[in-house]
Every structure is written in C-alpha cells, then in structure tokens.
C-alpha cells in the first residue's frame, strides 16, 4: 500500500523516468539520456520504498499506548518520548491512543537536523488527542530534508489507537507525551514500530 498524498511524487518520478527512457530509445541511447533514465528508475524505486504504508494489525487496548512512528527512540524526558525516523523507515504516523482530536496546531519554524535539541524550533504540527486518561500530545517535527508535514485528521475527529493521522515526508521526528497514569516501557536507543510497539503501560492501581 502507498501512503495517502504520495501520488503526485510517484507520478512525477515515474513520468520523468518514462520521458528519459523514450528520448534515450529515440536517440539511439545517447549516454546522458540513458544515464538519466537509469537514475529516474532508481528514484522511482526509492519513492515507492519511502512512501510505502504497510497494513498493520493493531491490538487496541486502554491498557497501553503504542508508538506513533517507526524509528529509534532518541530521547525520553519530562514524560515525553522522542522518536527519530530515518529515511528507510515507514513515515506514516499513527494515533498512540484512542480519543478525540481536540486541537491541531501548525507552527512555522526552521529546518535543523531533527535529532538536535535546537530542532524544538523547527516547523511542526501538534495534535492534542483527548483520551480517557487526559490529553496526549503528538508532535510531528520537520528536519533538514523533511519539509512537508501531512495531516490526515481534523479537529473533533475521533481516532482509534493505531489509526493513521498523518505523515512526514523524507524522514524526521515525532514526539509523544505520556500521561501520568502510564509507565514508560521503552528505552533510549530502542527501535519502535508505529501501531505495534508498546511504549507505555497503565499503572497497576488504575482500572481500564
């Protein structure tokens, strides 16, 4: 499955590849056109890999929160988990918990490397999901390459745990806040999968 909103990128790459291939054939394979056609094929393949959006079976539960993004945990502080998405990761983001989207705020900013602390001033999109345990903030942060944040959801939408809520093109970072009713279960350096990896579990003294 290809990620929603990626069609124009794939069409552009495939069209350029086809154009160079036709020109190369029509001109008896001029070296630079032949090279351009091969580069276009490689770019199209990269786009297909990058914009993939595999179906994942999500085990929905109020007993835990799941990762909103594929990637590596690069920081955990003040009950916030920061996940860096590399280029090879799936870049579709998912709701870590079921609830209602209370607020979506887009903020302009810079494009520093997303793994730097100064990236807090980067372009971002902040979701506030109101859950039965309080508000959960999911923040999509742009980086040096990722300069296009895509939103699939709207304010007042009800979302299920694991539902697709957006995407960041070409790698970046997603932060998620953890309510005090939960214990964080991941560590810095751990690899996580959106919709699959449990990142926090409900405390034993709470009912669900």
UniProtKB/Swiss-Prot annotation:
Site (Cleavage (non-hydrolytic)): residue numbering on this chain: 171-172
Record-annotated active site: 172 (schiff-base intermediate with substrate)
Keywords assigned by UniProt, alphabetized: Cell membrane, Decarboxylase, Lipid biosynthesis, Lipid metabolism, Lyase, Membrane, Phospholipid biosynthesis, Phospholipid metabolism, Pyruvate, Zymogen
UniProt name for this protein: Putative archaetidylserine decarboxylase proenzyme
Similarity comment: Belongs to the phosphatidylserine decarboxylase family. PSD-A subfamily.
EC annotation from Swiss-Prot or TrEMBL: 4.1.1.-
EC top class named in words: lyase
Record GO cellular component, one term: plasma membrane
Its membrane topology: Peripheral membrane protein
Compartments (UniProt record): Cell membrane
Main localization category: membrane
PANTHER family: ARCHAETIDYLSERINE DECARBOXYLASE PROENZYME-RELATED
An annotated GO BP: phospholipid biosynthetic process
Bound cofactor: record note: Binds 1 pyruvoyl group covalently per subunit.
Disulfide bonds: none
Record lineage: Archaea, Methanobacteriati, Methanobacteriota, Stenosarchaea group, Methanomicrobia
Modifications made to the protein after synthesis: Is synthesized initially as an inactive proenzyme. Formation of the active enzyme involves a self-maturation process in which the active site pyruvoyl group is generated from an internal serine residue via an autocatalytic post-translational modification. Two non-identical subunits are generated from the proenzyme in this reaction, and the pyruvate is formed at the N-terminus of the alpha chain, which is derived from the carboxyl end of the proenzyme.
Organism listed in the record: Methanosarcina acetivorans (strain ATCC 35395 / DSM 2834 / JCM 12185 / C2A)
Subunit structure: Heterodimer of a large membrane-associated beta subunit and a small pyruvoyl-containing alpha subunit.
Chain positions found as Pyruvic acid (Ser): 172
Keyword check for Heme: no
GO molecular function ontology, one term from the record: phosphatidylserine decarboxylase activity
Described purpose of this protein according to its UniProt entry: Catalyzes the formation of archaetidylethanolamine (PtdEtn) from archaetidylserine (PtdSer).
Reaction(s) this enzyme catalyzes, per UniProt: archaetidylserine + H(+) = archaetidylethanolamine + CO2
Cofactor: pyruvate
InterPro entries the record matches: PS_Dcarbxylase, PSD-A
């Amino acid at each position: 499955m290809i990620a929603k909103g990626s069609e124009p990128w794939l069409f552009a790459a495939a069209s350029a590849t086809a154009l160079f291939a036709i020109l190369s054939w029509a001109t008896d394979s001029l070296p630079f056109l032949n090279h351009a056609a091969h580069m276009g094929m490689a770019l199209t393949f990269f786009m297909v890999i990058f914009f993939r959006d595999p179906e994942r079976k999500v085990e929905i539960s109020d007993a835990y929160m799941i990762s909103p993004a594929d990637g590596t945990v690069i920081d955990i502080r003040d009950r916030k988990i920061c996940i860096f998405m590399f280029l090879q990761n799936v870049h579709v983001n998912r709701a870590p918990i079921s609830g209602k989207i209370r607020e979506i705020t887009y903020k302009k900013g810079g494009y520093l490397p997303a793994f730097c602390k100064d990236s807090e001033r980067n372009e971002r999109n902040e979701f506030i999901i109101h859950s039965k345990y309080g508000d959960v903030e999911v923040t999509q942060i742009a980086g040096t390459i990722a300069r296009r944040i895509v939103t699939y959801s709207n304010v007042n939408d009800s979302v299920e745990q694991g539902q697709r809520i957006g995407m960041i093109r070409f790698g970046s970072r997603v932060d998620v806040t953890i309510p005090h009713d939960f214990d964080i279960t991941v560590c810095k350096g751990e690899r996580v999968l959106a919709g699959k990896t449990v990142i926090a579990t409900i405390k034993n003294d709470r009912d669900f």
